[in-house]
Design a protein with these regions (language model features):
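Glycine-rich phosphate-binding loops of nucleotide-dependent enzymes
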Residues: 1-238
Length: 238
C-alpha cells in the first residue's frame, strides 16, 4: 500500500530522516517507535506532505506522491490524526465531522457527506455527543473527535501521531479498541506511540527508529529484545 525508498530529510546539520526504507501492507497496523528525536514525527510529516524530502521516493497505492501537496494525498486516501487536537470549539461534534467529510470535495452532495458522518460517528462512539460543542469535550472525547474527523476524509491509510498522549490507562485501553475497530472497518493504520503497552496490544509489526534511521523491524516481542533497540533506549552498557 505504502512504499518508502531512501527517504532523507536534513534540518541544517541534523539528518532527521536518513535513507529510510519502509513498507506498509494493506490491512495491517504498523507501529513506528523510538526515543525522542529519533525522526518519527519527521517521517510522518514526510508521508503526509507537510515536509518535502531532500532525497527518496514515496509511493502510495502504486503511484508516486513524493512531491504531492498534503491535500492531494488526502484526496487519494491518506488521512492523519494529530497529537494536539484542534477542533473548531464553537461548532458541534457533528459540524466538525462534516467539515472533514467535505474537505477538498466541493462537489460532494451534502447528503452523501452526512451519511459518511453518521457512519463515522457510530464507529467512534460519538453519537451521544453529536450536538455537543467541541469546546465542551473531555480529553478522551477530543481524541475520539480527532480520529473521527480524519476518518471522515475516507482514508485508506490512517496516520496516527501519538493520539493517546495524556490519556489515563483505562482511557488508552478504550482508544486501543477504537483503533482495532477502525482497522476492522477496512482502514490500514500506521501509528507513532511512546506507550509500549499500547504498541504491544495493537501492532502487527513494529519499526524502530533512532537518529533518523530504521534500526529494527518485526513483531513486538522480537524487536523488544533486539540489542540495537535496547541500546537506543537505554544507552550502550559500559
Amino acid at each position: 500500500m505504502l512504499s518508502i525508498q531512501g527517504l532523507s530529510k536534513r534540518f541544517g546539520g541534523v539528518l532527521a530522516a536518513n535513507s529510510v526504507n519502509l513498507r506498509v501492507e494493506a490491512g495491517e497496523i504498523l507501529a513506528v517507535i523510538g526515543p525522542n528525536g529519533a525522526g518519527k514525527s519527521t517521517l510522518l510529516n514526510l508521508i503526509s506532505g507537510l515536509l518535502r524530502p531532500d532525497e527518496g521516493r514515496i509511493e502510495f497505492l502504486g503511484e508516486a506522491i513524493t512531491q504531492a501537496p498534503p491535500e492531494a494525498r488526502t484526496w487519494k486516501g491518506l488521512g492523519r490524526a494529530f497529537q494536539i487536537v484542534q477542533p473548531f470549539p464553537e461548532m458541534t461534534v457533528w459540524e466538525n465531522l462534516l467539515v472533514g467529510a467535505l474537505y477538498g470535495k466541493p462537489n460532494t452532495p451534502l447528503k452523501v457527506a452526512e451519511r459518511v458522518v453518521e457512519e463515522v460517528i457510530q464507529l467512534t462512539g460519538l453519537a451521544p455527543k453529536a450536538q455537543t460543542s467541541a469546546g465542551e469535550l473531555t480529553l478522551l472525547e477530543d481524541k475520539r473527535l480527532e480520529l473521527a474527523r480524519a476518518l471522515c476524509t475516507r482514508p485508506k491509510l490512517l496516520l496516527l501521531d501519538e493520539v493517546m498522549a495524556g490519556l489515563r490507562p483505562s482511557e488508552a485501553l478504550e482508544a486501543v479498541e477504537l483503533v482495532r475497530r477502525i482497522r476492522d472497518s477496512g482502514v490500514t493504520v500506521l501509528f507513532i506511540e511512546h506507550l509500549m503497552p499500547v504498541v504491544r496490544a495493537l501492532a502487527d509489526r513494529v519499526v524502530v527508529m533512532d537518529y533518523g534511521q530504521v534500526i529494527a523491524e518485526g513483531p513486538y516481542d522480537l524487536v523488544a529484545t533486539n540489542p540495537k533497540v535496547r541500546e537506543a533506549y537505554l544507552g550502550r552498557a559500559s
